[in-house]
């Protein structure tokens, strides 16, 4: 498909599933400014659109790393979910980040496994998994963070511990 900013913007404004999917595919990166990204992410109302827009558009943005952290810090379910999904995709593409950024990402993701939102929890677990898959050092780092959760009575910590355990046994 040929990229087309005006068409993508018009499609996004339609409250129709297929229009939003196509908008994410047609939007040129060069004209998709951070302010527009924030408007789009605020209009995401379901997990399918969140996943597809992160895959087709958000992960390719030059400002995606900073924007994903900004979204992760948001309280709204789908904004936070998009932040984690975008970060997970960036980890699959690049995987490298500063120690400070990786520490912040892990802190936020570990906190998010306690979220009441199923989608936020799953996206947080995904970003932790992708972080671990990047290197043995990352996997070891996460293992150290969750080793005390083996006997936790908190559901989120149990899910995280079991996911990390599965990931390290593969």
Give the residues covered by each predicted segment.
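Alpha-helical scaffold domains
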Residues: 1-170
